[in-house]
């Protein structure tokens, strides 16, 4: 297996630089086809469309000086406020260090030709999302990342949608925020949770 981190143009990046996780040589555990995909089109689109001839795994990562990898989130869920790419895991890591926060989900919302960062939090029972708690979350994120990571809007939700394997579904929530149809609802363990993100008045201005 030959693992490399590449930018959007396919150039190999050095340690500490964030980009797409790719493999340029085959490896024993890679799938060779998808079920019900006789032409192989879905398989090719999933892994080989972005960089022809290279396996693109779909993770936004950086290589360490020792050859390890830090994963910042799925590359298709990377935020892009002001043209700066931000991995969602960088925000989760800080937001969920706040005692009152059980879990969180962050998406980018298109607004006025740019992307604003919107953070949803599920709080411990009996905790209200006050302005003081919002400030505490923002301060924690700003202190340990960059000002670009700080969410413009923070909202609370009673539940966060996830797949049947337990992964949160940022893209589905992002589509809800933009009024788009949701694909593969039957893949979600709790599709009703999407209703908590729909038609939020705080997101219309």
Predicted regions: what is each one?
Residues 4-5, 62, 161:
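Hydrophobic beta-strand positions
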């Amino acid at each position: 297996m030959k693992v490399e981190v590449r930018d959007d143009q396919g150039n190999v990046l050095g340690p500490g630089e964030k980009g797409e996780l790719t493999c340029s040589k085959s490896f024993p555990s890679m799938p060779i086809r998808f079920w019900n995909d006789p032409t192989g089109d879905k398989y090719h689109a999933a892994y080989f469309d972005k960089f022809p001839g290279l396996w693109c795994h779909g993770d936004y990562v950086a290589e360490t000086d020792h050859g390890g990898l830090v994963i910042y989130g799925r590359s298709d869920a990377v935020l892009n406020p002001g043209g700066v790419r931000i991995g969602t895991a960088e925000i989760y890591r800080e937001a969920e260090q706040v005692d009152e926060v059980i879990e969180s989900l962050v998406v980018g919302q298109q607004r006025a030709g740019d992307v604003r960062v919107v953070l949803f939090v599920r709080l411990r029972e009996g905790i209200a999302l006050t302005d003081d708690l919002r400030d505490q979350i923002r301060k924690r994120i700003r202190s340990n990342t960059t000002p670009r990571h700080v969410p413009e809007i923070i909202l609370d939700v009673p539940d966060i949608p996830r797949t049947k394997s337990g992964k949160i579904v940022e893209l589905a929530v992002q589509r809800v925020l933009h009024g788009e149809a949701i694909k593969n609802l039957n893949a979600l363990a709790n599709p009703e949770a999407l209703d908590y993100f729909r038609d939020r008045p705080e997101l219309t201005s």
